[in-house]
């Protein structure tokens, strides 16, 4: 069996990686060194280790919580949203059903650790408050969602990380939420010490009765009572709340203003405030702030004028393995918050907030321009070199987010949750625009003489619609042809003859399917794959291409 030719160039990565490649000509330029010009296969074999190392996702990220990093970090520098979901699932002990473990998980362990530390000082802080604030009653203030009541199952199984206020109200009115792990016992302990227990929640006044009922039902007993439970008002705001925009108070204005009222008018001294959002805690009027972990949503709010509180700010640096395994050992704050990831992705694609990408100008398009410009520099020379060697030069292209652009489907239609039936509608209706810059590039390659192959994870029933979509958006006639366009066989059908030896029998991984098909293009059809192009690393690994060109895509991950 011929030796696999591993990929030897990755393009389209973040600037730092491109700079690394440029600084290492023995890897980045297959014809730079005289000894590497003996044969293509000698050259490729010499670079196996470097090539494989390059064809792996990033694991370190810098991301601001407001999404602004999408303007500067590049596609590979944005945490991939599917990897974020897997990391969150691991952290919460979710086995894939969208429900969190209620008995053991890294999340439960972290919350228990936080509350053990708090429990150790409950009595001493209570006594200190009595001494320092004579005539005032020591109090603890608690947020509700993911502070006292646990919303993971609603957020993930029911909503798939896309908030639905009507569905949320159903869960609230039906009192479906379990207690946040270890929190009910902690609140009962605090009440037994003598603390006044106060709830301040972003839930509406219409949800107060059901929320109190839910809290009592899951173990808080009578710790939370109507006089000491504050919800967002309907109608006129309370007189003790001061807001910059009177008709639209921020979370910090509402919660800090309520804490101020409790201390100034209710004769309480707030020893500690507890919340899962930084905006639950900002604005002062509490001796201590206790942040509970929650990477499943982010509710930002500006701090009050003059308040710095730099310690009450989200993380901006993260380490995350693509397979989700980081959820076993990083803290909740060490997981990229999924709402911040979504905002960063939207910024990167020029999405104004409606789930559609800008088709003319965005950081994503700017990155593709650089990538295509870089590839064009060697497009003709690589073709001529292959012809001089007596080879038939070919290029292999993936479809989704390589030649056809799926952002609007993935985000506006699916909200980052893949739906195979909806995807098939889009495919059969030929709804996809071209991936920016790729039409001219592919057509140029075809005009130079390259044979162009398509190699997609779409299935055989989608082949004709995909070819029609490609033609419709401008890929020149004869560029993508049925004979040179490979789709996956449908379940129950026989794989092509060249697909054999997959670890799962007739069920092949993406890497097995695509690398074996590239081997078929080379060894059975007689072509040399000069370059393979894809938005997923699994499009590219496995060899049988002189160069691997990675397009950026943080919107899904197919390992």
State where each predicted segment sits:
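C-terminal cap/substrate-recognition subdomain and adjoining C-terminal extension
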Residues: 37, 43-56, 206-343, 359, ...
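Active-site neighborhood of HAD-like aspartate-dependent phosphohydrolases
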Residues: 148-182, 388-389, 403-436
